[in-house]
A protein has these predicted regions:
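Conserved alpha/beta enzyme-core scaffold
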Residues: 1-115
């Protein structure tokens, strides 16, 4: 099969992609300028479909709506870096802080520290 056809078959919209997320899933997103803001926006648009979805990342640069108190029943925020957008939710107990150096992140998953 031609790679271009395979690529075309996998194309989807953000709204369609986030419908695959189920309650209790873990979503690991890029951080800082690599944060997938369109996907996070689609997740927020669909938040009523979720309960207990864990969102893991380091530095959040966008609005981080999933950190807000009104979204606590939908999302558990697991921050690997306590930045400005996540600090309040960590201090209020609505988020988990997993301190980690950037170079250690692959080990969190390969050694099942974050199972």
């Amino acid at each position: 099969m031609d790679w271009k056809n395979v690529y075309r078959e996998k194309l989807t919209t953000a709204a369609e992609a986030v419908r695959r997320i189920k309650s209790g899933d873990r979503v690991v997103v890029g951080h800082a300028s690599g944060s997938p803001e369109v996907l996070l926006g689609a997740i927020m648009d669909n938040c009523d479909a979720y309960s207990g979805v864990e969102i893991v990342h380091m530095v959040a640069m966008g609005p981080s709506e999933y950190c807000k108190g009104e979204n606590a029943r939908h999302f558990l925020h697991n921050s690997l870096f306590a930045g400005a957008t996540s600090r309040e939710s960590i201090n209020d107990g609505r988020a988990v802080f997993t301190p980690c150096h950037f170079s250690q992140i692959p080990r969190l998953f390969s050694e099942k520290i974050l199972p």
